[in-house]
From Swiss-Prot:
PANTHER family: 60S RIBOSOMAL PROTEIN L37A, LARGE RIBOSOMAL SUBUNIT PROTEIN EL43. One of its GO terms (biological process) is translation. One of its GO terms (cellular component) is ribonucleoprotein complex. This is Large ribosomal subunit protein eL43. GO terms for molecular function: large ribosomal subunit rRNA binding; structural constituent of ribosome; zinc ion binding. A zinc finger (C4-type) spans 38-59. It comes from Thermococcus gammatolerans (strain DSM 15229 / JCM 11827 / EJ3). Keywords: Metal-binding, Ribonucleoprotein, Ribosomal protein, RNA-binding, Zinc, Zinc-finger. Belongs to the eukaryotic ribosomal protein eL43 family.
Length: 86
């Protein structure tokens, strides 16, 4: 008990890997587990189903994205390029 005060969900690693790494893991997991904006309906209801698979709880849209976030920096650039060509 008491291993998760500083590092949250990364407390499962115990004393291994160092505090900096465990804090980084906890930050990534916190962003991953929050609800994200749906690209189809615009609601903040997108949850991660599996690695890189995201689903909106409101409209049911399922789409591929990043492993930890629904949009990646490379995906944003690609979307911008496609929009400028159209």
């Amino acid at each position: 008990m008491g291993r998760t005060v500083k590092v949250g969900s990364a407390g499962r690693f115990g004393p291994r890997y160092g505090l900096k790494i465990r804090r980084r893991v906890a930050a990534v997991e916190a962003r991953m587990k929050q609800k994200h904006v749906c690209p189809v309906c615009g609601r903040k209801a997108v949850r991660r189903i599996s690695t890189g698979i995201w689903q909106c709880q409101k409209c049911g849209a399922t789409f591929a994205g990043g492993a930890y976030l629904p949009t990646t920096p490379a995906g944003k650039v690609a979307k911008r390029v496609v929009a400028s060509k159209a």
